[in-house]
Amino acid sequence: MSDNVVERGMRYLKNNGVKATLKRIKNGPAPIPPKNNLLGFYNFVVNTEEIPFDKKAYEEAKKSGKITLNWVIPEMSPGSGGHTTIFRFVSNLEKLGFHSKIYLYMSPTFKDNESIRSFLKQHFPLLDERVEVYCDVSQMGFAHGTVATAWTTAYYVRRFNNTISKFYFVQDFEPYFYAHGSEYEFAENTYKMGFRGITAGDWLKDVMRNDYGMTADSFLFSYDDKIYKPKEKTDDKPRVFFYARPVTPRRDFEL
């Protein structure tokens, strides 16, 4: 067993106690309660138990001189566009000398580190191999910055204090994923948690700043010009681009 595994195990023991640690060793990461178990499913929203600052880990990080980032992400499917953008950012940061560690949050599928690492290697080969990947946030330790990447992950980052700075990587206005009800409010509430925003495009940046008082910066939309190339124009016929996505209510497909 590597020293790194031992350190993570001791950290989990320190933060969660003997009983929880033994249960995790036996069962792996805790399963997500079904949605009809209302209190269990939404426990992550009301859970305010803080993960404390580890001064010893901070001092060790100062000695190393390397800046580290924790990225808390939801589970993904092959080819997920949002995750592709995250992994592209993470990989470029790695090349610039910022070391990233990725942690899944509330994953129903990946119960060990090897399974998620193999999945990413197969379906997201663009991810820099130096980036560390873990199946669950229970293994997460100190980092100079910790980044929430979806509204569900923001609730965990809110109580994760083993870090210096907290960021929110916002790629969409997530309340619009839902009808105007509880989940809309849960998602919207994360914009008021005091994180520094990094948004996809200026519209989201302006919404975060003007409507929620968030300090935010944006990045412009881009494409991979090694894959996507403009075709030569052959005529002057007007054409309409129709973006159709029936499975997403906010796209107004029926209209």
Q: Locations of the language-model features?
A:
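N-terminal pre-catalytic "stem/leader" segment of glycosyltransferase-like enzymes
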Residues: 28-141
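Short hydrophobic "strand-cap" motifs at the C-terminus of beta-strands
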Residues: 72-74, 200, 242-245
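Membrane-proximal helix-turn-helix segments that form the acceptor-binding/catalytic region
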Residues: 134-142, 180-197
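A short, active-site helix/loop in glycosyltransferases that binds the activated sugar's phosphate group
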Residues: 152, 156-157, 177, 193-216
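Boundary detector for helix-to-coil junctions that initiate low-complexity/charged tails
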Residues: 1-29
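Acidic anion/phosphate-binding donor-loop and adjacent secondary structure
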Residues: 46-60, 175-182, 217-237
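Active-site proximal beta-strand in glycosyltransferases
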Residues: 147, 160-176
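Conserved catalytic-core segment of nucleotide-activated headgroup transferases in glycan assembly
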Residues: 85, 91-94, 101-104, 210-218, ...
